[in-house]
Amino acid sequence: MSSTKTPISLTIKLNQFTDKPTGLDINPYHNSPIMWRNIIKQLSSRTPQKLLFSSKNRTYSFLGFGQDSIFKDNTKFRSLIPISCSNIVMGFQNLGEYLPGDEFLSRPLIKNQVNNNFCCRKSYASVAEAVAVSSTDAEEDVSVVDEVHELLTELKKEEKKQFAFRRRKQRMLTSGMGHRKYQTLKRRQVKVETEAWEQAAKEYKELLFDMCEQKLAPNLPYVKSLFLGWFEPLRDKIAEEQELCSQGKSKAAYAKYFYQLPADMMAVITMHKLMGLLMTGGDHGTARVVQAALVIGDAIEQEVRIHNFLEKTKKQKAEKDKQKEDGEHVTQEQEKLRKKVTNLMKKQKLRAVGQIVRRQDDSKPWGQDARAKVGSRLIDLLLQTAYIQPPANQLAVDPPDIRPAFVHSVRTVAKETKSASRRYGIIQCDELVFKGLERTARHMVIPYMPMLVPPVKWTGYDKGGHLYLPSYVMRTHGARQQREAVKRASRNQLQPVFEALDTLGNTKWRINKRVLSVVDRIWAGGGRLADLVDRDDAPLPEEPDTEDEALRTKWRWKVKSVKKENRERHSQRCDIELKLAVARKMKDEESFFYPHNVDFRGRAYPMHPHLNHLGSDICRGVLEFAEGRPLGESGLRWLKIHLANLFAGGVEKLSLEGRIGFTENHMDDIFDSSDKPLEGRRWWLNAEDPFQCLAVCINLSEAVRSSSPETSVSHIPVHQDGSCNGLQHYAALGRDKLGAAAVNLVAGEKPADVYSGIAARVLDIMKRDAQRDPAEFPDAVRARVLVNQVDRKLVKQTVMTSVYGVTYIGARDQIKRRLKERGAIADDSELFGAACYAAKVTLTALGEMFEAARSIMTWLGECAKIIASENEPVRWTTPLGLPVVQPYRKIGRHLIKTSLQILTLQRETEKVMVKRQRTAFPPNFIHSLDGSHMMMTAVACRRAGLNFAGVHDSYWTHACDVDKLNRILREKFVELYEAPILEKLLESFQTSYPTLLFPPLPERGDFDMRDVLESPYFFN
């Protein structure tokens, strides 16, 4: 064997569909692979091998060639993947990818100026070179077996990188956008995520300049002028405080955190975050100090991290020439890293910036105390500098009425069960600011907007979602054990969950402009239509001109009631403004995306909080799929069914053919609604979901009026909803025939209505009780009163919440509210007694119809009680591998002193809440199962080429694909419950707590799960 040790790089061609490499290409110009077994042969052989290079027959070692190489001097060896496949560097990710650990900093690139390929010098740039380092001569005392293992290991690494690369490229292709368009949108997305606060601060500074130069302030919207008036004095106060802190003159505990961000950005964040809390809080323009301080402090810390990183690398660049010789390498690598981040908004290397910054930033998280102190100080400074002046409507000689915009006060709330009271600090805005809050949304910085490009694929607890904004795969709400459980889980274990979230996040949406224009017209006209709140407050009743205390007491109660209603209206108006602000901002985008994450039970949610498909009718009405698909004959049928479902009012309980008939009988109304939504007969306003109904009216009208309705394109998401889905899961767990029939797990001519079924049972029991002697059975009188009040509406809420473990007291209060609404029983004591009796009968009827569900619910609760009694939280793993830890622990209190007040921070203790662990486990376990079913369906739909969106127990796709969706969701439900779910749960409990004794599994019925496949109304 030749002793020449000049290494060559071998191009490894990987097959994305197999686990084995297809061959090794050592020809720099052609793909003429040597089969894998031949390479192994060469490795295993101790004799020289002859390899053929471009028809030249020479003798080479496996990893070298003679000094008279056949390759030209200027030859640069090829990268791992051919040029046509968007090369990645040997051992490197493609542009925009992230290399873990020190690998990121350790590989300088050499670029071939001819073919734009890259190779790595002084690193294991290829499998061949990696093996070459360990053995290039048959005489060395290294095992050939070790060489083979090393080769296999390196191949596996490269294959994983290539597979990830191909998946990402495929995602880009399936997103329906070319490379150039994708990069343009990506740059915009990064600006949205990284420059929002900076741009807001810049805008205020420019407005201040314009105001001074051109007197433009009077032309600003009222709320914008308020923000502008507060910005400069707040910024200056912050700057003064920062100077004291940076010079060491401030002894405050927050001092070392306070000067890490420019004063203008801190001012903007403080104003916007506080106003956001005042808008979204439901308490009449107030926010709790502790909540506001933590929210503001957290936002400041997030901005500080990236700011510190960029500033640190700037300084390192400036000091490069002063570095000692042994530190030059570090400086060079830091400079390379800085360039990667600073080019973030211009180039492709965006995906990993969050991880880069976190890895390079060696500063520890601030902690809750520091965030609270920084936030409190900023609120304190805003209180000192923010003033408001009513519009000028007084004589010039009068002094201006200038008053603080915000007031800090303490609120005392009496506890229900104790004589003691609870006190907490609040920030309350002036009435003028309060009235302006509803118009503030369009001027607010709204983080976590829908994305312009597909979200980053999830690969870990904090790796995925947004390109740059902090994103976490689970909403743990500070539950440490839950967070640690997810972090400990392997990527392989969580891959099914990651894949499902990626599927949901890759669904493309757009704004339905026609529906949005109707919403805007109604809102501009004062609301009051289509369930939109009245934009005006209800007038307060006039004070009676009398000394009669009874009349005055009645008046005071009316005033209190009207004020409560006005507070609710205000909250709803703010909510609508936020939704419309997002819709208006996104209406001209061709498409956008919602990154998703899960709650601790495994239910998926969009990360954007305001305008999303989990929201109200107005959200769902203005959102539609960005991709349109021809209806086809099946799609036209399902669009008609969908319209009937949205109209509701009992229509949704008809058979599918009955619903189609309803729609066809109202085609004139549908045309009128589409053509003249506000000027015509307004039939669509009678629907239970009016804006969604209007959207379907428009689409259906276009299709029916076209020359070929089947080829008409539809963007409408058509829903398939479960029938009391929680009870469906219980019936499947218990193989309960009676329960399965009640919730449509078996086929029927029309959908079974579980609420009507329970109401019928309740009525039978009450009729029987009404015949009894009141002297022996006191409830007989109540039964006689209630017989005429029993219907599905009376029992619906109790049946719905039964899956959540509703208690007798909860059921009593629910039924009492329904009876009070009807005014059937005037006397309060009689009303209470009737509600008690009705609740008892309703729960009895539920137990009879869903006996298996009750027994499973009881078993789950008993297991949870046994575990929690050992001071352990209940843990389980969902069918998709997500670890769940119930977060219910007793809360401890921690006092910290801030510049504003003493704050009480809540912290988890080590003591679990036994009762809460027990009562919450059954519904949480069922939610983890419905989340698993939705995720399984989502992934299967993607693989079948369907667009999919999900809202827990409501699955959406294009009208033309509903039949495919129905088949898939039924198959996945059967697949889910063919697994021994309860057996595995019990086994996991026994393994985790071997010293505890758990009750045996409840008996189950003989319902055949495969009957679900033939049930048309299981989801419909």
From Swiss-Prot:
The active site is at 721, 796, 953. Its main location: plastid. It is an enzyme of class 2 (transferase). SMART domains: RPOL_N. Its EC number is 2.7.7.6. It catalyses: RNA(n) + a ribonucleoside 5'-triphosphate = RNA(n+1) + diphosphate. Gene3D superfamilies: 1.10.287.260, 1.10.287.280, 5' to 3' exonuclease, C-terminal subdomain (1.10.150.20), DNA-directed RNA polymerase, N-terminal domain (1.10.1320.10). One of its GO terms (biological process) is mitochondrial transcription. It comes from the Eukaryota. Keywords: Chloroplast, DNA-directed RNA polymerase, Mitochondrion, Nucleotidyltransferase, Plastid, Transcription, Transferase, Transit peptide. It is found in: Plastid, Chloroplast; Mitochondrion. Residues 314-336 are annotated as: Disordered. One of its GO terms (molecular function) is DNA binding. Belongs to the phage and mitochondrial RNA polymerase family. DNA-dependent RNA polymerase catalyzes the transcription of DNA into RNA using the four ribonucleoside triphosphates as substrates. PANTHER family: DNA-DIRECTED RNA POLYMERASE, MITOCHONDRIAL. This is DNA-directed RNA polymerase 2, chloroplastic/mitochondrial. It comes from Nicotiana sylvestris (Wood tobacco). The lineage of its organism: Eukaryota, Viridiplantae, Streptophyta, Embryophyta, Tracheophyta.
